[in-house]
Amino acid sequence: MAAKEVLFGNDARVKMLAGVNILANAVKVTLGPKGRNVVLDKSFGAPLITKDGVSVAKEIELEDKFENMGAQMVKEVASKANDAAGDGTTTATVLAQAIVTEGLKAVAAGMNPMDLKRGIDKAVVAAVAELKNLSQECSDTKAIAQVGTISANSDESIGEIIATAMERVGKEGVITVEEGQALENELDVVEGMQFDRGYLSPYFINKPETGSVELESPFILLVDKKVSNIRELLPILEGLAKTGKPLLIVAEDVEGEALATLVVNNMRGIVKVAAVKAPGFGDRRKAMLQDIAILTGGTVIAEEIGLELEKATLEDLGTAKRVIITKDDTTIIDGNGEETQIKARVAQIKIQAEESTSDYDKEKLQERMAKLAGGVAVIKVGAATEVEMKEKKARVEDALHATRAAVEEGVVAGGGVALVRVASKIGELDVINEDQKHGVIIALRAMEAPLRQIAANAGEEGSVVANNVKNGTGNYGYNAGNDTYGDMLEMGILDPTKVTRSALQFASSIAGLMITTECMVAEVKEDAADMGGMGGMGGMGGMGGMM
């Protein structure tokens, strides 16, 4: 076991604070509309230019082990805020630095660290409750666009494209961000349910100009097994021929004689039919077949629940307004399922997603939910160079997370104003001694830090701006974008309540732990000089005759 170096008391806290400051100072230059960029060196490819707090924090690793421990703990603040709300990482870092700095000063002055932490915790609990009171619902497209714009560093085009995407696919819909090919941002919306399985035979194509199959008002047969015997399909096909409507078969697979007969019937015009494989594998395939059944008002023919394909009737089939099949995917538009059943299925999947511990499973469940709820939107980010593309894509992703958070928990005045108002509204809290009271004061003072930093990044004096804002009431605040004061909501400067709340809670939690640190343990760094015992390798020169 390697030897350890141990630091106690003030020596440990000074080192830890140095690490906190290095990381926080690198992150906080990005805060606000006039925040600067940070350039991150990459071992391969072009450097990454970013204004995303968590991206900067993740890159920082310090040489001094004790300083690095402080930096890593603040990195955890940014990371947790990012996981919870997807934004607010820089705000969380600024809050953590402010609480740690003031807290360690108080500890050095002889105050009890545990009482300070209890005071900070009480102030934060009161602040979170007050934030909920200040919060306003965010449901209209204009407010969603404003939240996205602020989060994307005042880029209105990003805010608007996110608001449009949400309007098109609904609040539960899936919105993904991809790198585009053009200079401008583009929005692609796939309405209806789409899954990545194409036609099983090109002979099903009835739109040669697009290379696709289009079925108008088709019946949809859902089978949870391989179909290879045409006799199993005959009762359905005979019933279908009388109606004159087309048929889509979604099965584990359709092969051999069954596929050949379907192709021949389709080409002769006896029955208009197309077949695709069911999406997913194993249990996920069963679940997705059930999703399609609920969406289209059909029944999944599965032997495990006692249903046989030969005995299926037209009543077991689902229906939709339209189906489009390409070689890669199938889209079912306007399924005729019952609205109440679709909503119940979405609610059921939502509960599964919330309870899931796997990120992959969560993502797949959310995709299923979106396909049932209305569709999928893809924002294709446009830029002139790859470096700009990466920076812009990160901003779009942040803005998307922020708008989702705003829809979930509402919005408060942006620009750090909400925390200043919250701090001013918290009155006397139930504390048992002076040290706890000082802990409350530390937390309330720290709540001004984001506003001060936004002002400082805009070239203003933070204290002057903070005093001006404190003298105002309600949503009155400082717009760093154009250096004016006014009503933040009217100016469209909004922050999601969830983002502000998460930043405050995570910052106070980890900062409180750092204040109560009394001892730090790290491995002793071995000098390169101590590694000099490897010099005896020089006797390999006689290997030349091996050629």
UniProtKB/Swiss-Prot annotation:
PROSITE patterns: CHAPERONINS_CPN60. It holds the Pfam family Cpn60_TCP1. Forms a cylinder of 14 subunits composed of two heptameric rings stacked back-to-back. Interacts with the co-chaperonin GroES. It catalyses: ATP + H2O + a folded polypeptide = ADP + phosphate + an unfolded polypeptide. It comes from Shewanella pealeana (strain ATCC 700345 / ANG-SQ1). Belongs to the chaperonin (HSP60) family. One of its GO terms (biological process) is protein refolding. One of its GO terms (molecular function) is isomerase activity. ATP binds at residues 30-33, 51, 87-91, 415, 495. GO terms for cellular component: cytoplasm. Together with its co-chaperonin GroES, plays an essential role in assisting protein folding. The GroEL-GroES system forms a nano-cage that allows encapsulation of the non-native substrate proteins and provides a physical environment optimized to promote and accelerate protein folding. It is found in: Cytoplasm. Its EC number is 5.6.1.7. This is Chaperonin GroEL. Keywords: ATP-binding, Chaperone, Cytoplasm, Isomerase, Nucleotide-binding. Signal peptide: none annotated. Its main location: cytoplasm. InterPro entries: Chaperonin_Cpn60_CS (IPR018370), Cpn60/GroEL (IPR001844), Cpn60/GroEL/TCP-1 (IPR002423), GroEL-like_apical_dom_sf (IPR027409), GROEL-like_equatorial_sf (IPR027413), TCP-1-like_intermed_sf (IPR027410).
